[in-house]
Amino acid sequence: MIWKRHLTLDELNATSDNTMVAHLGIVYTRLGDDVLEAEMPVDIRTHQPFGLLHGGASAALAETLGSMAGFMMTRDGQCVVGTELNATHHRPVSEGKVRGVCQPLHLGRQNQSWEIVVFDEQGRRCCTCRLGTAVLG
């Protein structure tokens, strides 16, 4: 297991109370040895005007996952902040849920890189994101 902080899914989800994460309906669903996953509904909260999943919602899911994963790689007195987010959208989604899967690309002392892949309910890749974070403290 790569994580330096040991949180349960319930504890992870509690951090979202009264935030944009909760407003978008993002829920952490899996914490593995080197992976963090979450689901987000594709509905009125996450649609763009043409009834498809908004690219910004996919980016919000990615940054949520990468930032939390980055935080779990810090020690007491440290935090992480996002420095760069790149998102490539591959296919539209109009309803249901999407699932984000976050895994590390680089875990340095001062910076981290995370890959977050967003899948639709059929398991098709909808979006590929890369998040860079800086470790502070």
Curated annotation (Swiss-Prot):
Family annotation (Gene3D superfamilies): Hotdog Thioesterase
Active site: 63
Signal peptide interval: none
Origin superkingdom: Bacteria
Coiled-coil annotated spans: none
Enzyme Commission number, as recorded: 3.1.2.-
GO CC term, one of those recorded: cytosol
Function description: Required for optimal enterobactin synthesis. Acts as a proofreading enzyme that prevents EntB misacylation by hydrolyzing the thioester bound existing between EntB and wrongly charged molecules.
Family: Belongs to the thioesterase PaaI family.
The name this protein goes by in its record: Proofreading thioesterase EntH
Organism: Escherichia coli O157:H7 (strain EC4115 / EHEC)
